[in-house]
């Protein structure tokens, strides 16, 4: 009987550890310093004091394209209240593909281009879009994999602002 209890407790610990590991990175958000299409460097470290939404996406990704209008609305609504959004494109075609898409979609928040090394720093990304919410102290507060509505995003960031 006692052995069954020990096995049960150990099983719960294993499940808890597995779930914690599956969440992706926690703690301090990995820094990046990447240029936007105008050549301005966007550095995560310099955004401390703001809630930062870091969104990994690509122009060819349908769910990514669908969530962008809501991200634009959130940015316009909350940028004066301490919200920053940084879109990190994972398009292999680089600015040649991304810049026309930014213009066509009228994206108002900063867009930069990431690479495999940055993806690795964020714990590897299994799907896009993947969004990290970084609190005012620079720590990853939340992570969301997949499409997100404006309302979903608002729920993730509002309490942190």
Please provide the spans of the model-predicted regions.
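Hydrophobic beta-strand core positions in alpha/beta domains
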Residues: 53-55, 87-89, 132-133
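Thiol/disulfide oxidoreductase modules built on the thioredoxin-like
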Residues: 100-108, 113-158
């Amino acid at each position: 009987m006692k052995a069954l209890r020990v096995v049960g407790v150990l099983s719960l610990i294993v499940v808890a550890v597995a779930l914690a590991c599956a969440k992706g990175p926690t703690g301090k958000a990995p820094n990046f310093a990447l240029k936007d299409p105008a050549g301005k460097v966007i550095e995560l470290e310099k955004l401390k004091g703001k809630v930062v939404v870091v969104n990994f996406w690509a122009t060819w990704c349908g769910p990514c394209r669908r969530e962008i209008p809501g991200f634009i609305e959130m940015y316009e609504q909350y940028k004066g209240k301490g919200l920053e959004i940084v879109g990190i494109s994972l398009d292999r075609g680089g600015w040649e593909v991304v810049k026309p898409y930014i213009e066509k979609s009228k994206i108002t928040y900063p867009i930069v281009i990431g690479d495999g090394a940055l993806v690795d720093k964020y714990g590897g990304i299994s799907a896009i879009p993947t969004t990290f919410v970084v609190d005012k102290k620079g720590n990853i507060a939340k992570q969301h994999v997949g499409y997100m509505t404006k309302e979903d995003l608002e729920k993730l960031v509002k309490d942190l602002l």
